[in-house]
């Protein structure tokens, strides 16, 4: 399955896009969380409505549960205990980031409602570059899946929606199951 909006890529193999920018240590990232008063919430909503670039990674700005994925289900699916989680409210619905014991996130989920089909495809091309991933598709959703040195990615697009999931496991099936659960729970 070819993605029509994917641009030609250099022949060198690329690693997937960063799952959660600056996500490293949840405690260190929490220093930037100011409690999100109503002005912060309004700004986050406005940014989501204005549209972030297709290449925008998740940056946790609120330490709370993911509104569309059950934390125990996520832990069971990825095969790792969940120690903390947070969301990035700049996205609508918010991006979800889950940690286990390592400093890096175990799972990052970004769901994008883009202004156009082409921009949704650009999200998938950024998350799962066509030259370093295999095709992925199900029920009208198309995109890519790939395994890298310390992670895997599953990213798909349908109409003007894109869903990208990164996991620290080297099995795309886990990322795929999480993406499908997010799609189902959000009724996309």
Predicted regions and their residues:
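Sec-dependent bacterial lipoprotein signal peptides
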Residues: 1-4
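Bacterial lipoprotein signal-peptidase II cleavage site
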Residues: 6-37
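Sequence contexts marking disulfide-bonded cysteines in secreted/extracellular proteins
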Residues: 7, 65-67, 95-97
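A short, solvent-exposed beta-edge/loop patch
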Residues: 10, 25, 37-62, 134-188
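Secreted/processed peptides and extracellular or luminal domains of membrane proteins
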Residues: 12-13, 71-72, 102
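Amphipathic alpha-helical segments
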Residues: 65-81
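Short, solvent-exposed recognition patches
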Residues: 76, 81-141
């Amino acid at each position: 399955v070819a993605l029509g909006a994917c641009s030609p890529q250099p022949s060198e193999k690329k690693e997937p896009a960063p799952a959660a920018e600056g996500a490293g240590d949840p405690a260190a990232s929490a220093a930037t969380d100011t409690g999100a008063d109503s002005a912060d919430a309004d700004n986050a909503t406005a940014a989501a409505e204005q549209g972030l670039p297709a290449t925008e990674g998740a940056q946790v700005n609120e330490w709370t549960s993911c509104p569309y994925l059950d934390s125990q289900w996520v832990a069971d699916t990825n095969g790792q205990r969940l120690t903390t989680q947070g969301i990035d409210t700049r996205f609508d619905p918010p991006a979800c980031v889950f940690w286990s014991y390592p400093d890096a996130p175990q799972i990052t989920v970004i769901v994008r409602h883009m202004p156009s089909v082409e921009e949704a495809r650009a999200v998938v091309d950024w998350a799962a570059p066509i030259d370093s991933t295999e095709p992925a598709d199900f029920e009208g959703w198309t995109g890519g899946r790939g395994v890298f040195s310390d992670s895997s990615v599953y990213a798909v697009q349908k109409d003007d929606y894109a869903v990208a999931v990164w996991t620290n496991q080297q099995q795309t099936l886990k990322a795929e199951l999480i993406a499908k659960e997010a799609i189902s729970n959000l009724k996309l």
